[in-house]
Amino acid sequence: MAFRHSKIVCTIGPASCSPRMIRRLLEAGMDVARLNFSHGTHTDHAQNIATLRAAAVEQEKPIAILADLQGPKIRTGPLAGSRSVLLRAGQRFVITTAKVLGDSTRVSTVFRPLPREVHRGDRILLSDGLIELRVLKVRGPEVICEVINGGALGEHKGINLPGIKLKVPALTSKDREDLVFALKHGADYIAASFVRRPEDVLLAKTLVQRAGKNTPIIAKLEKPEAIENLDAILGAADGVMVARGDLGVEMNPERVPVVQKTIITRARHFRRPVITATQMLESMTENPRPTRAEASDVANAIFDGSDAVMLSAETASGKYPVEAVSMMARIIEEAEASDWESPRRVPLEKLKVAETVAELVCHASRELHMRLIAVFTHSGFTARMVSCYRPAVPIIAFSPESATRRRMALIWGVMPRHIPNVQKIDGLAAIAEKRLLEERLVRKGDVIGIVAGTPMGIRGTTNFMKFHVIGGPA
């Protein structure tokens, strides 16, 4: 059975939002669709959600929708004529909180505290770090700078202040509006941007609970402060994203690979799914094939233990969105087929019953050469627990809950499947065998593992394990 354990997250944008393109992305291997709330209107996102849901039903493939909030991103303002301007090394350049149309000498920002937050000698980076400024002085609403590294500056580009701990809210008013919208439209995950401390995650969770939902929160790690508070954030979040774009601007590029491995290792320790993101196949925005370095980057993220890898501009605005997904799927499959062994999760000091059952069934799957592991779950807890121990065989997650099946689309090694509510533990083997034979996922004589919890339907009660031979007594 051809199977890919690691999942693919695709950002939906102008290049990929049509029904035809959504269908092609699903066929190529998309598991999770990311909606970037830094761009587009609520009308755009509502249309994309409807298109995604319709395509998922048509192809009978559960797909998770990840709503990615903009966060307290500081950006430059508009430019005269909406045209890029060229900044040259050595010239003076002003960033002002006044409302002005920018040009080659100045640009506005809506971040009003900026003049209070920076001082002489501080570095300011624009446009994902491509342009570097040094603060000369602050005069009223103006921050007067010298251009150290020049370049072309477009409208609404990011402003980064390395080494400066900004006093900004974890969620802006726009984020709160977008969060309510995303929850109303059934987003399966919420990504909180620029998380710096666990309180940022807890705030997002509080707002989710107030809306009467239990939607998981993914913490995007893109600030050095987040790395300082990594374990506390992992304890609060439901998953994390290694957002290497802003992370690579806020810290020296040579540190990013080490930090990436640290985040993934700690996330595995805390049993949190981790998405590795940003510029993975960046050249495929313009070219039909990636560079060899990009292919290695994707493979190494898999070797590190990522649950999922993400495409951003490659699928949102690139020329080859379908080819990028197909290429990423092939790289993952090749990496997973190699002799390189995925790192096992670092065990906690004391295993609980659920963890012990999950670890044992994964160990048995190797010893008994199982075809797959069948998991019966309402909330997805059992499937996530088994996934933590990285079995070599697929995890078929049977659930009567549509929201659970969609969320499982992000989790490593899990193939979500619908099944009616099962009340009795005795019939699990017969139910699993019938369904698996119908889908031709097993053959007579195959050994499978069955994991569930009793009483059935109660979260966190993973305490049942059975080995079953297809065609044998149930």
List the model feature ranges, each with a label:
Residues M1-A474:
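Non-catalytic helical/linker scaffolds that mediate oligomerization, partner binding
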